[in-house]
Amino acid sequence: MQGSARDFLKPKLVDSVELSTNEYRVVLEPFERGFGHTLGNSLRRTLLSSMFGSAITEVLIDGVMHEFSTIEGVQEDVLDILLNLKEASVGLNASETATVIIEKEGPCQLTVADIEANGTDVSVFNPEKVIATINEGGKIRMTLTIGTG
C-alpha cells in the first residue's frame, strides 16, 4: 500500500461487456492490495440483499408431530423430505403467498411437479426433483405455504 491517501491507485473502468440479458462483465483496475476483495464482497452482498424470490416457507404434514418422525409407507423420513423441499425451486405468479395441498398414494414418487399441479399461482423450475418415494400402501398429505421475500 502507498504512503498516503493521495498516493492510492485510482481504479478506472477498463471494460464493460453484456454477456446476456441478465449478465454483465465489468473490469475495473488497478486496485491496491486487498481492495478488490473488499469491493467485490460489498457488491455481492448488495446485489444479493436486493434480489427477490419465492420459496417454501411452511410445511405441515398430516400425522407428523416433529421433523424427526417417520411416515408409514414413505421411504424417506420427515427430515429428508424437508431437505428435499428446501431444494425445490418455486415461483409465485400473482400473489405474495400461496397455499398448496398435496395428496399422493403409493407406489409412486412425489416430485416438485406435484406442487405446480396443485397450485394455480405456483410455477416450478426443477419439476424432476424427487421429494419422497411412497411405497405400496403408503400415502402422504402435506400443506405447503409458499412466500416471497
Feature names for model-found ranges:
Residues 1-149:
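Protein-protein interaction/assembly regions in multi-subunit complexes
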